Amino acid sequence: VVFTFFVPPIPGCEDVRQLTPNDEKKKFLEAYGIDYLIEYPFTEKVRHTAPKDFIREILCKKLCAAFVAAGPDFCFGYERKGNVALLEKMSSLCGYEFEVFDKVSYKGEPISSSRIRACISEGQMEDACEMLDRPFSLSGTVIHGKAIGHTIGFATMNLVWPEDKLLVPIGVYLSKVKIGGNTYQAITNVGHRPTVEKDAAKSDLLLEAHLLQYSQMAYGEEIEVSLFHYERPEVRFSGLDALKEQLKKDTLACVTYFEERGNDGKKEGFVEERA
């Protein structure tokens, strides 16, 4: 059982963009074998709950917790005054077992959500992937675009960037896209399409993924896009011919990247997973 607070997203508020929004969190926890997820409403009353009251009223009375585990830096209760020392002290009084998880390090420093967020915000996708134990990804329904990619041989699957999802630097990423049980290598642009948009700065932030070795229509389909490597910034090209030539270079970079790295260091083809 995993206990977490549910904080409703606030549209348009950059401060609440999440590394893993609620829907994604549920999917990942299920994949990791978690049986139950408790999303406790984070109301004003809960926010002002004293640490000891949180343990007695929520952990013990409402959840009937028999075993509690937390990281060494875990804080809770009003003004974050509760800590693992208090959880340990109250365990005998409230009848639960308590264990502190050890910190996990990467490149000699402890892994934390703030460190992962910083890596993603700076485009350091490989480091983020290592610390997350998975690539940074997002899911959504494919929407219609302007179909300009079709005219130059680089059709894309388009997603609007979710309002509650942590932003990545604008640019082109070497990626993988999962659709219909299969996973394909892809070049993915996250940005405002300055080559084809007259007023790009005011356009929606769009994710455009060109899948290698995939040519079917996917409008209305659910896809998952995983960003493995930040390749280059988004550029305004002189025209579609120049854009096409750059996309050819990006495609070669994508193929080379995954040939060298693959999954677990193994070379693999374009289609890697089947349902």
How does the language model describe each region?
Residues V2, E39, V100-D102, L227:
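Structural signal for conserved beta-strand scaffold positions within catalytic alpha/beta enzyme cores
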Residues D35-Y36, E97-E99, E224:
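Conserved beta-strand segments of alpha/beta enzyme cores
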Residues P41, P72, V190-H192:
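Short secondary-structure boundary segments
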Residues H48-A155, K178, S238-A242, E268:
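Classical nucleotidyltransferase
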